[in-house]
Amino acid sequence: MLNPIVRKFQYGQHTVTLETGMMARQATAAVMVSMDDTAVFVTVVGQKKAKPGQDFFPLTVNYQERTYAAGRIPGSFFRREGRPSEGETLIARLIDRPIRPLFPEGFVNEVQVIATVVSVNPQVNPDIVAMIGASAALSLSGIPFNGPIGAARVGYINDQYVLNPTQDELKESKLDLVVAGTEAAVLMVESEAELLSEDQMLGAVVFGHEQQQVVIQNINELVKEAGKPRWDWQPEPVNEALNARVAALAEARLSDAYRITDKQERYAQVDVIKSETIATLLAEDETLDENELGEILHAIEKNVVRSRVLAGEPRIDGREKDMIRGLDVRTGVLPRTHGSALFTRGETQALVTATLGTARDAQVLDELMGERTDTFLFHYNFPPYSVGETGMVGSPKRREIGHGRLAKRSVLAVMPDMDKFPYTVRVVSEITESNGSSSMASVCGASLALMDAGVPIKAAVAGIAMGLVKEGDNYVVLSDILGDEDHLGDMDFKVAGSREGISALQMDIKIEGITKEIMQVALNQAKGARLHILGVMEQAINAPRGDISEFAPRIHTIKINPDKIKDVIGKGGSVIRALTEETGTTIEIEDDGTVKIAATDGEKAKHAIRRIEEITAEIEVGRVYTGKVTRIVDFGAFVAIGGGKEGLVHISQIADKRVEKVTDYLQMGQEVPVKVLEVDRQGRIRLSIKEATEQSQPAAAPEAPAAEQGE
C-alpha cells in the first residue's frame, strides 16, 4: 500500500506541500515538493560503501525541467529533452553550493541528487522549490548530512523586502536575491541588484534567512515522521603518530614555501616538498597509504596559511589583509573588434571583448517559464593554459557557465535600455591567466570593453572577491583573494557594483558561524576595494566613447504607418528581401511601424531609408508624378510611379485625341508624366497622361512622410 506522508505550510504568499512515501521507493529518499502548482520531484541515492581509493566526495546534483510540466512538447528535432540548458545548469549549481559543505569531512561515499520539474506555475520559479526538495530528501535519507537547509528568494519593491516574489513582482523589483542556510547560519547567497547599498543587501540576506526558518522546522517535523535511520558512518580515526611524523618532516619547509610570492615557483616548491616527504615516509614504512599521506600534507598546508593570516602576518604573496594586487588596465587592445580591454590584477588576467549586433542576433530562449529574448549575452571561457595546465577544450563546463552568469548579473544593472541603444551586445571574457577571482576580473574587463565599444552604460562597474579565515572568535577578512586563499579559507564572497551601489553579490560559506557582523565587515571592506579598482579603471577610460566602432553596424530608426508594413515586407517577404540585397543592409520591422536599418556604411543606410520612404509614400489624388512604363496592353499601359506603386493609364487617357494603338504613343521603359485620377478601395490607381500634359505644373516625385532618424 502507498502511504504518503504530507506536510503543508504557508511560506510568504505561497502554500508549500512536502510529500514522501508515494513514489520512487527504491531510492534512498524521495520528496515531491509543490509551491502553488509548481512541483519538483527530488530523489537522493547514496552508496553505502565508498569506492576503494576514493579521495574526494563524489556528490552529483542534476536538475532537469520536463516540458510536460508546462503542457508543451519539446521543440527539438527528436521532440524530447536533451542535454541540460544553461538555466538548468545554473539551478543545479544553486542546489549544490549550500548542501556540499554540510556533508562531514572524510565522507567519500557517492551521493546523487536528481531534481525533476514535473509541474510549473509561470509565476513561481522552480529553483527555490528544488532547493527545498533537495534539503528535505537528504534529511530524510539517513545519509550523514548536517542539514536541513532552507531557501528563499528576496525581492525589494517600494523600499520593502518581499519574500518569494512572483515573476510579475520580480519585474518591479530592484533586487533578485536567493539565500540558503541552516537554522543557525547563512551558507549561500546569489543575487543581482539595481545598485543597492551595502546595508540594503545585508538586510535582504538577514531577512531571507529569518523567513526560511519555517522551511527548516517543517522539514525537521517530516523527518520525525518519515525519516530513515541515520547511517552508522564514522570518519577514519586520526593517526596522531603519523600526523606528527609528517609535520616534523614537512611543516617548516611548507611554511617557507608559502613565503614564495610567485605562484608557479611556489607550486613547484610545494610539489617537491610533498614528493620528498612521501618518498622518505614510504622508505621508512612501505605499507603506508600514499593518499592518506597526501591528505595529511594538505591539512598541514591549510594550517600553515590560515595560522599565518590569523596571526596578522603578511599573506602568501606578501600583502596585508586589505591590499589589492597590482592593476594594469588597457583598452582598445584588439584593432578590429567593436570594443576590447585587457584587465590584469596580479596573476589574474582577462581579455574581454564587446560585440554589437542587431535585434536579429538576440538569443531566443524557450524556457519552461515561457519564451524570452535576451539582448545581452556574456560568455566566460577558462582555458587550461590560464593555470599552466593541459586539458580538454570545447563546450563550456558548469563552472564557466556559472562564472559567466555572475559576471553578466554584475553588468546588467548599468546596461542601457533597448529603446535608447537598440543593439544586441555580446561580451566574451577569455581568462588568459588565473590566480583567484577571474569572474570579477571579467566584470572589470567587461565594463572597460563596453565603454571602449561606445555602449552608453550608466556607470563603470568593478568586482572584487573577499575571503575569510576564522578560528573560534578570531577571524580575518581578506580582500582580493588568491586561488589558494579561496581553497584554504572559509568563505568566497564576491561583490560587484559601481560607485553608487552593488549590482551583484555571490557568497559561498564553508563553515557555520558566519555572523551578520562578519558579513558587514566583508561588505564594507569590499566597497573600499571596489572604489580603488574603479579609480584605476577610470584612468584608462572614464566614460563610454562618443561613437561606436567603425566596424560595428550603425542602426538608423525611422517610423512608418503600421498599415504600410505589409508593403515593405511584400508577398512572402519578397520586397524586404530585395531591399536587403539591393542596399546591403539589415532591415527589421516592429509591429508599431518602427523600422531599424543596420549598416556599416552610412550611404547604404541612407539608400535603404530612401527606398522604404518611397514604398510607404502616400499617393495623392490630383498630383502629377513622373512614372515609367512597365507593361503595355491593348486597353492601355501600366506605369510605375515609385515606391512599388503601379497604376493604369487607360487608352482613353494617353492623348487628347483618339488612340488606335498604344505602342504608337508609348514604349516599354519610357518616362512619362502622369496625373493620379483615383485610388479605389482596393488600392488600384487610375492615371492620366493626357491630364498631366495639360497641367502647367512640373512633375513631382512621391512625397514621403517625415521620418525620425536616429543612431
Swiss-Prot record:
**Cofactor(s) for this protein?**
Mg(2+)
Q: Which residues form the S1 motif domain?
A: 622-690
Q: Where is this region: Disordered?
A: 689-711
Is Manganese one of the keywords UniProt gives this record?
A: no
Boundaries of every KH domain copy:
553-612
Q: Which GO terms describe its cellular component?
A: cytosol
Q: Where in the cell is it found?
A: Cytoplasm
The protein's UniProt keywords, in alphabetical order, are:
Cytoplasm, Magnesium, Metal-binding, Nucleotidyltransferase, RNA-binding, Transferase
User: What reaction is this protein's catalytic activity?
Assistant: RNA(n+1) + phosphate = RNA(n) + a ribonucleoside 5'-diphosphate
Keyword Nucleotidyltransferase appears in the UniProt entry: yes
Q: Which Pfam families match?
A: KH_1 (PF00013), PNPase (PF03726), RNase_PH (PF01138), RNase_PH_C (PF03725), S1 (PF00575)
Q: How does it assemble?
A: Component of the RNA degradosome, which is a multiprotein complex involved in RNA processing and mRNA degradation.
The record, for PANTHER family, names: POLYRIBONUCLEOTIDE NUCLEOTIDYLTRANSFERASE, POLYRIBONUCLEOTIDE NUCLEOTIDYLTRANSFERASE 1, MITOCHONDRIAL
Any idea what this protein is called? Polyribonucleotide nucleotidyltransferase
Species of the source: Shigella boydii serotype 4 (strain Sb227)
Taxonomy, top ranks, is: Bacteria, Pseudomonadati, Pseudomonadota, Gammaproteobacteria, Enterobacterales
- Gene name, per UniProt, is pnp
